[in-house]
Amino acid sequence: MKKYTILFGAICAIILAFSLNAKADFTSTLSFSNLPPGNPGPYGTVDVSLTGQTATITFTAAAGYFFGDGSSAAVELNTDSFTEAFVSESPSNNFKAFAFDQQVDGFGSFDLAVDQKNFAVKLTSITFTVTNTGTAWASDADVLAVNANGFDAAAHVFSTSSGLTGFAAETPGEHHIPDGGATATLLGLGLAGVAGIRARFGRN
C-alpha cells in the first residue's frame, strides 16, 4: 500500500506542476531592435494573460526605454476573428487608435497595433485586451502567432540614452510555438490516472 501512496503523491505533484504551468502568463521579450549600436536590449516585455477567451496583453518597457507614436505596441494573433479594447497606459494615456494589418518597420505586418498620438508622452506600459471569436485558444501561449517575418510582437521604442527611436521585437530564432492544447491534454491524462489509482486502491 505504501508504494501506491508514494505513487499517488508523485502523480499529484506532476498534476500540480502542469496546472501551475497552465496558469502562468506567456511572456515574449523584446530583445532585438533596429536602433543604432549603443542602444542595447532588452527593450521590454510582452505579457499575455488569458481568461476564458479574452487575453489581456501588456507591453512593459525596460529601463532606459519608452514606448510611443505609431505602432507603439503590435501583435500577431493566432485567430482570424477577434475584438479589441483599450485598457490603460502609464504614466498617462496618449492612445490614438487601433490599427489593423499594420506594417512595423523592419519586422513585417501585424494583425493589431496600438497607435499613439505622438512621442509627447513616453509610455512605460500599454495594456489592451483581445477577445477571440474564432477557434478557441487553449492557453496563454496560444494567443500570439508569428507573422510572415517570424515575429509575434513588436514595439516602437525611444532610447533615453541616445534620444533615438526605433522598433524592437523578440530575437530571431526565439519564436514560440502555440501550445495547441497540449498542456490541457496532459493535465487531463494525469487526472484520469489519479482517478484510476483511487478506484483501484482507495479502499485498501
Regions found by a protein language model. Name each.
Residues 5, 54-58, 183:
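Ser/Thr-centric signal marking residues that sit
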Residues 18-24:
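Sec/Tat signal peptide C-region and signal peptidase I cleavage site
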Residues 200-204:
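Short, charged juxtamembrane terminal tails flanking transmembrane helices
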Residues 7, 167, 173, 185-187:
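Serine/threonine-rich, low-complexity intrinsically disordered segments
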Residues 9-17:
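Bacterial N-terminal signal peptides
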Residues 1-8:
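Bacterial N-terminal signal peptides that target proteins for export
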Residues 178-198:
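A short, hydrophobic C-terminal helix/tail in secreted or cell-surface proteins
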